[in-house]
Curated annotation (Swiss-Prot):
This protein's name: Probable Xaa-Pro aminopeptidase UREG_07123
Keywords, comma-separated and alphabetical: Aminopeptidase, Hydrolase, Manganese, Metal-binding, Metalloprotease, Protease
PANTHER family in the record: XAA-PRO AMINOPEPTIDASE 3 (PTHR43226), XAA-PRO AMINOPEPTIDASE AN0832-RELATED (PTHR43226:SF3)
Species: Uncinocarpus reesii (strain UAMH 1704)
Cofactor(s) the protein needs: Mn(2+)
EC number: 3.4.11.9
Cofactor annotation comment: Binds 2 manganese ions per subunit.
Gene Ontology molecular functions: manganese ion binding; metalloaminopeptidase activity
Chain residues that bind Mn(2+) 2: 194, 205, 379
GO biological process: proteolysis
Length: 413
């Protein structure tokens, strides 16, 4: 709500007077000697868009003064029940149920300042992803990728990551949230790097999948990358205010099925039949995307991918709704959403699929040749505008990505 990252601060907003007050810790000499001074009143007023700053010790009295000027039964809204201040005022009511839903609804639309922070987070992430591409040909372990990414972000002033870095090589890329990042790169075809910097509390969420050398290591790797690239491009270009995000999610599955039919991985059915069977979930098990903001999976009022249960009757891919957290039935200008299709070759998922009727649509013998690819995911953060979209992520992909890998390899030759 305020962008204040300092500990032990409190924030109140008086709706009637439209007054935003930040309460900062009282000065503590011992704490200041050991840890440095805490945020002061003058600094708080200068740094943050607030109406007034006060010390924490005045909070309870301010609440009592506020309550004394209000009618009996006036309500103070708090985020959590354990945040209620202890005040001796029997007629004061606290509500911890209604504030979070209201805040969630407000957070789905970003203003210009918020978009600027997300844009800067993406710029830093792009720089870090590019540094990895320049150095990947000389790296030996997933841990080096993680360390280099962190180093690049911190050097640009972003000390915090939006989420735990995923640096998954080979078959590890088939694990959606792989974070061990401790295996050697030798003999692996691709690396899936899902990593994004945080800037002033706002997140970025960026994924690139790439080889260790400036060429595709196999026909299978190139084919899968091309499929995912098309899935992403087709979905992004359809983003606009009023578009239903769930339709883009289903479109991504249809494109995946079409392309996997072309490769021979799917067989014996039409796009509609395979979609209805759920077979595409074996290879694309997560949602197309989510909001980005103060959290990497940002909150919102209502999720497009988590409709009311009755609204799912007759919809394909019912099992996909949980991973997506987009709210509101249709996209609106000011939303920032990820578009992150992926195709994965998980041994566990394939073994499970063999036991199901949908296995008749999958050429298990052929798909075994793709297991060393692991998985491919490409993810950008996209701003919804009134007449379309703006991609806030500019990390290289495709041919430009390979060119940078090649430049780095030549410098080390």
């Amino acid at each position: 709500m305020s962008g204040v990252a300092e500990p032990d601060c409190y924030l109140t907003y008086d709706i009637t007077s439209d007054t935003l007050t930040l309460y900062v810790p009282d000065f503590d000499l011992r704490r200041a000697i050991w840890m440095g001074p805490t945020l002061g009143l003058a600094e708080a007023r200068e740094r943050y868009n607030i109406d007034q700053a006060k010390y924490r010790s005045t909070l309870e009295q301010d609440i009592l003064d506020w309550a004394s000027r209000r009618a009996i039964g006036s309500v103070i809204y708090v985020i959590h029940d354990n945040q209620k201040p202890v005040v001796p005022f029997p007629y004061l009511k606290f509500n911890h149920e209604d504030l979070i839903p209201a805040m969630d609804t407000c957070r789905e639309i970003k203003d210009g300042h918020e978009i600027g922070l997300i844009r800067r987070a993406n710029e830093i992430s792009t720089s870090a992803h590019t540094e990895i591409l320049r150095n990947i040909s000389g790296m030996r372990n997933e841990a080096e990728i993680q360390g280099k990414f962190l180093d690049s972000c911190v050097s640009l002033g972003a000390k915090n990551q939006s989420y735990e870095i995923i640096a998954a090589s080979g078959e590890n890329a088939a694990v959606l949230h792989y974070t061990r990042n401790d295996e050697p790169l030798k003999g692996r075809q691709l690396v899936c790097l899902d990593a994004g910097a945080e800037w002033n509390c706002y997140a970025s969420d960026v994924t690139r999948t790439f080889p260790m050398q400036p060429r595709w290591p196999s026909a299978e790797a190139f084919s899968v990358y091309s499929v995912v690239q098309r899935m992403q491009e087709e979905c992004i270009k359809r983003i606009s205010e009023g578009v239903r995000y769930l339709d883009l999610h289903i479109l991504a599955h249809k494109i995946a099925i079409e392309e996997l039919l072309r490769l021979g991985i799917f067989r014996g059915g039409s796009i509609a039949e395979i979609l209805k069977s759920g077979a595409s979930l074996v290879f694309f098990p997560h949602g197309l995307g989510h909001h980005v903001g103060l959290e990497v999976h940002d909150v919102s009022g209502r999720s497009l991918m988590a409709l009311e249960e009755q609204e799912y009757q007759g919809l394909p891919l019912r099992g996909c709704r949980a991973p997506c957290t987009l709210s509101a039935p249709h996209l609106r200008a000011g939303m920032v959403v990820t578009v992150e299709p992926g195709i994965y070759f998980s041994r566990l998922a394939l073994d499970d699929a063999k036991q199901k009727p949908l296995s008749k649509y999958i050429d298990m013998q052929l798909v075994a040749e793709y297991i060393p690819v692991g998985g491919v995911r490409i993810e950008d953060d996209v701003l919804v505008t009134r007449d379309g979209w703006e991609n806030l992520t500019s990390a290289p992909k495709g041919r430009a990505m390979l060119d940078i890998i090649g430049e780095g390899a030549r410098l080390r030759a």
